[in-house]
From Swiss-Prot:
Gene3D superfamilies in alphabetical order: 3.30.1440.10
Family in the record: Belongs to the universal ribosomal protein uL5 family.
GO biological process, any: translation
Keyword Ribonucleoprotein among UniProt keywords: yes
Any one GO CC term of the record: ribosome
InterPro entries per the UniProt record, alphabetical: Ribosomal_uL5, Ribosomal_uL5_bac-type, Ribosomal_uL5_C, Ribosomal_uL5_CS, Ribosomal_uL5_dom_sf, Ribosomal_uL5_N
One Pfam family of this chain: Ribosomal_L5
Function according to Swiss-Prot or TrEMBL: This is one of the proteins that bind and probably mediate the attachment of the 5S RNA into the large ribosomal subunit, where it forms part of the central protuberance. In the 70S ribosome it contacts protein S13 of the 30S subunit (bridge B1b), connecting the 2 subunits; this bridge is implicated in subunit movement. Contacts the P site tRNA; the 5S rRNA and some of its associated proteins might help stabilize positioning of ribosome-bound tRNAs.
Entry keyword set: Ribonucleoprotein, Ribosomal protein, RNA-binding, rRNA-binding, tRNA-binding
Gene Ontology molecular function: rRNA binding; structural constituent of ribosome; tRNA binding
Quaternary structure and interacting proteins, as annotated: Part of the 50S ribosomal subunit; part of the 5S rRNA/L5/L18/L25 subcomplex. Contacts the 5S rRNA and the P site tRNA. Forms a bridge to the 30S subunit in the 70S ribosome.
Lineage: Bacteria, Pseudomonadati, Pseudomonadota, Gammaproteobacteria, Alteromonadales
Protein name as it appears in the record: Large ribosomal subunit protein uL5
């Protein structure tokens, strides 16, 4: 079991229930899933780029990503309907907790010029979205073996009803928000 999951059950859940006055354990916000998305527009010109992106995403997430394809043709971007343009992974359960632990403890502190996560990135329903500019902040990625530095989107989906509950949940896991 991941340390953060144990921490959630033992300390975070009771604290949030007390803070927001929840009567049932099921009312307490919890993290439902973490979605990682990497847009690889260059894959249209070079098919090898997608292979490298899939390899990086597999190393970071610990599970095989799904290739996302273009839904419609856009002449300006030289893409056709059905072209592979990215990859994504949805983490749940044990892998989700392990990834969150690595993200908070290892990856976020390795971001260059880091001054805290923006609290404005909540969507109004307690879910948090963030962007990472370089995949090399994750320890699984070897700097010598990457072909190009590329970023990704990370969305943390919670069962919180509003942003206040979502922020309290993530702060309980030592998420470094700007003050």
């Amino acid at each position: 079991m991941a340390k953060l999951h144990d921490k959630y059950q033992e300390t975070v859940s009771p604290e949030l229930a007390k803070k927001f006055g929840f009567t049932s354990v099921m009312q307490v916000p919890r993290i439902e899933k973490i979605t990682l998305n990497m847009g690889v527009g260059e894959a249209v010109a070079d098919k090898k780029v997608m292979e490298h992106a899939l390899r990086d995403m597999t190393a970071i997430a610990g599970q095989k990503p799904v290739v996302t394809v273009a839904r419609k043709s856009v002449a300006g971007f030289k893409i056709r309907d059905g072209y592979p343009i990215g990859c994504k992974v949805t983490l749940r359960g044990e892998r989700m907790w392990e990834f969150l632990e690595r993200l908070v403890d290892i990856a976020i502190p390795r971001i260059r010029d880091f001054r805290g996560m923006s609290a404005k990135s909540f969507d109004g329903r307690g879910n948090y979205a963030m962007g990472v500019r370089e995949q090399i902040i994750f320890p699984e990625i070897e700097y010598d073996k990457i072909d190009k530095i590329r970023g990704m989107d990370i969305v943390i989906t919670t069962s919180a009803k509003n942003d206040e509950e979502g922020r309290a949940l993530l702060e309980a896991f030592n998420f470094p928000f700007k003050k």
